[in-house]
């Protein structure tokens, strides 16, 4: 449906903006990155000219990348490159459960448990590739218990439906 496609397109644009913002921040690779035990409330809805969207937290995204040691969570042997600003391997944050579906959950999904670290190739594969279903399935099973610890309950079928898979 056209409305859903429009929402997902805007969701992807917001995620791209997050990626750009993170690229401009100097990251401390020696910091200890970890999950929080706190259940976070839903983020605030921000209105723009066209609709309302949920704000992404860049600190949470950076922490999620750090938890993964700035490597691709599909395969940590995937090639990355060093960022100009700080020499940290470049990976991209991806909300496994897209933020466009935040309304379906009682707590925030803009959390480290829902943000995976991906090499550019795998990130684009999830959005545009033939193997997106495989990648989403792999990540789902790796995150399912982490989701449940944050009172986020979602089936693989439901998650795949968010990606039209």
Task: Write out the residue ranges for each language-model feature.
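Generic hydrophobic, helix-prone segments enriched in Leu/Val/Ile
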Residues: 3, 35-39, 62-67, 132-142
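Short, charged surface segments at domain edges that flank catalytic/cofactor-binding sites
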Residues: 26, 30-88, 100-110
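A detector for short metal-coordination/catalytic motifs
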Residues: 88-93, 97-165
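Residues that form generic nucleotide/phosphate-binding pockets
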Residues: 21-24, 63, 67, 142, ...
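The canonical Cys-X-X-Cys-His
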Residues: 13, 17, 72-75, 122
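Internal, Lys/Arg-enriched amphipathic helical interaction segments that engage polyanionic partners
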Residues: 1-34
């Amino acid at each position: 449906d056209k409305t859903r496609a429009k929402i997902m397109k805007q969701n992807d644009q917001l995620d791209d903006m997050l990626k750009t913002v993170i690229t401009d921040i100097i990251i401390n690779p020696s910091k200890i990155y970890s999950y929080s035990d706190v259940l976070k409330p839903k983020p605030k809805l921000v209105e723009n000219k066209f609709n309302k969207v949920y704000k992404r937290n860049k600190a949470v995204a950076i922490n999620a990348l750090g938890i993964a040691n700035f490597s691709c969570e599909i395969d940590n042997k995937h090639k990355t490159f060093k960022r100009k600003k700080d020499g940290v391997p470049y990976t991209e944050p991806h909300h496994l459960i897209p933020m466009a579906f935040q309304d379906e959950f009682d707590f925030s999904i803009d959390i480290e448990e829902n943000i995976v670290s991906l090499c550019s190739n795998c990130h684009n594969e999830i959005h545009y590739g033939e193997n997106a279903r495989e990648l989403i399935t792999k990540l789902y099973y790796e995150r399912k218990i982490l989701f449940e610890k944050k009172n986020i309950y979602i089936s693989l079928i439901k998650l795949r439906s968010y990606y039209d898979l």
